[in-house]
A protein has these predicted regions:
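Hydrophobic h-region of N-terminal signal peptides that target proteins for export
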Residues: 12-19
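GH16 jelly-roll
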Residues: 19-345
Length: 345
């Protein structure tokens, strides 16, 4: 969710909007995955032993236009689905999450935004190092709509963003607007979702790498439910849509640096930063630096309220080696190998 812009990495044999494009090959689920956590949203209310709301109006660090609230108008469970609802309404609330600041003066700061929405997280309720994460969801459409399923470090061991990393399982912006995908036929609508890692040093020394997945227009992710998944092991991270393994990122393509008290930087060794506990986040942002600068540009205020629907969230760990997560991989040879950034010497 901290993306400012995307360098598009083309998929080998990627999907196009043409109906004659062969169906992508699904990968058989690797053996050894053991279900360790789930929310099927089968209760009448959001399970607050599993999820907590973020409450702030700071715009996500991306100039987004929403206040995140804990109100039932913005998030609720009904008919077996989690509803995350963005509404166009002027709203004033706290600038920061209460756990992000240390002084009363900072906690009392407020801001006003033209939209409300919700951002849910499992921080300190459920955190994981390595595993398979599956989320079945239907996404909102429109210029400025930015749904995301992602992960942040719980302990920030290597320092502030992005020294400690960020894992984006799925993001989409501006679905069903006119696409600016240069590989799509003229006049096509936006269908892409994106998987991304953020790493490197503390902003502005952060970097990111990722890959898009292109749906056919007949199967737009704003019209249908799809399963978005990520497999994370010690030396590799893999992305999936509906069991299609579409991208892989190897550990020799990422790095992490931490800033010292004297201002110098050191490179963190091993598999940093993706060797620590992370937690899940689900949210629906409106506007921001990424969606407002692509497709039709700006934010379309029409059509609200809009919602992101989540059918289930399931987390698996590799029973063959829970310490490294290695041994249960679901792989497809045609998946693109993401090229990362190297540590600047």
């Amino acid at each position: 969710m901290s993306v400012k812009s995307y360098a598009v990495i083309l998929l080998t044999g990627a999907l196009s909007a043409c109906q004659q494009t062969p169906a992508p090959v699904k990968a058989s689920l690797g053996e050894g995955w053991q279900l360790v956590w789930q929310d099927e949203f089968s209760q009448n209310d959001l399970d607050l032993t599993k999820w907590q709301h973020e409450v702030n109006c700071r715009g996500g660090g991306n100039d987004e236009l929403q206040c995140y609230t804990a109100r039932s108008e913005n998030s609720f469970v009904k008919d077996g689905l989690l509803h995350i609802v963005a509404r166009q309404e002027q709203y004033t609330g706290p600038l920061h999450n209460s756990d992000e600041v240390s002084s009363d003066a900072e906690r009392e700061k407020q801001a006003t935004q033209p939209f409300t929405s919700a951002r849910l997280r499992t921080k300190n309720l459920a955190d994981w190092r390595y595993g398979r994460f599956e989320i079945r969801a239907k996404l909102p459409a429109g210029q400025g709509a930015w749904p995301a399923i992602w992960m942040l470090p719980t302990d920030w061991r290597y320092g502030r963003w992005a020294s400690s990393g960020e894992i984006d399982i799925m993001e989409a912006v501006n679905l069903k607007t006119l696409t600016d995908d240069k590989t799509a036929p003229a006049g096509s609508l936006e269908t892409r979702v994106h998987g991304t890692l953020h790493y490197g040093g503390p902003a502005p020394k952060n970097v990111y790498s990722g890959s898009p997945y292109r749906f056919s227009e007949a199967n737009n992710p704003a019209d249908n439910f799809h399963v978005y998944a990520l497999e994370w092991q010690q030396d590799e991270i893999r992305w999936y849509v509906d069991d299609v393994h579409y991208a892989t990122f190897r550990h020799d393509q990422w790095y992490s640096t931490s800033q010292q008290q004297d201002g110098s930087f050191i490179e963190n060794t091993g598999f940093a930063p993706f060797d620590q506990r992370f937690h899940l986040l689900l949210n629906f942002a409106v506007g921001g630096n990424w969606p407002a600068n692509v497709n039709d540009k700006g934010v379309d205020f029409a059509g609200y309220p809009k919602q992101m629907l989540v059918d289930y969230v399931r987390v698996f760990q590799c029973s063959k080696n829970s310490e490294t997560g290695i041994g249960c991989a679901t792989k497809q040879p045609s998946a693109v190998q993401i090229k990362g950034k190297t540590y600047p010497q």
